[in-house]
Regions:
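Short coil/turn segments at secondary-structure boundaries
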Residues: 1-4, 82-83
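Short, surface-exposed acidic/glycine-rich loop or hinge patches that mediate macromolecular interfaces
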Residues: 60-61, 105
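A short glycine-rich beta-alpha junction/loop motif
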Residues: 47-53, 83-106
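Hydrophobic side chains in well-ordered alpha-helices
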Residues: 65-66, 111
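Short Ser/Thr-interspersed hydrophobic loop/turn segments at strand-loop and sheet-helix junctions
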Residues: 5-39, 44-53, 57-59, 66-79
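Amphipathic alpha-helical coiled-coil/heptad-repeat segments
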Residues: 99-145
């Protein structure tokens, strides 16, 4: 739904929109099949999810720490376990059986904050790179009018 009120998470990297929500929580959403198999989104609030998108919520540890741990550990697990059918997919046990080391809260927070800082900086640098590319294209067009 183009002007839907709530994000609708599918196996794509970016959510679509929908008019109804099924969840009102803080969650990690993991693509369970297709080209983006294992892609992890984080969301807090009201949303809906496609049937092949795993919704992980109600964490007793730092959810951001878990997100970063999954970004490292899940691709390795997927490489071993994914189905090689026409559409690759994972099953719930792929996630449930994953062993994530859980350090103390202080270390979890430190790791999560550090990774979020790197992610923000990377995002800023990518945006700056995009601006430089646009400026370069503009200047080239001006030079060859």
């Amino acid at each position: 739904v183009e002007n839907g009120q709530y994000p609708f998470f599918t196996c794509a990297e970016r959510p679509f929109n929908i008019d109804s929500y099924a969840f009102d929580t803080e969650a990690l959403l993991i693509s369970g099949n297709g080209a983006n198999l294992g892609y992890i989104n984080y969301y807090k609030g009201k949303f809906n999810a496609y049937q092949r998108t795993y919704v992980l919520d109600h964490f007793s540890v730092n959810i951001q720490y878990v997100k970063w741990a999954l970004k490292v550990l899940l691709p390795k697990r997927i490489a071993i376990e994914k189905s090689s059918s026409n559409t690759p997919y994972i099953v719930l046990s792929t996630l449930a059986d994953l062993k994530i080391p859980i350090p103390n809260n202080s270390k979890q927070n430190h790791i999560a904050n550090l990774m979020q800082s790197f992610e923000r900086e990377l995002s800023n640098q990518l945006a700056l790179n995009d601006l430089y590319n646009k400026q370069k294209q503009y200047m080239l067009r001006q030079m060859f009018i």
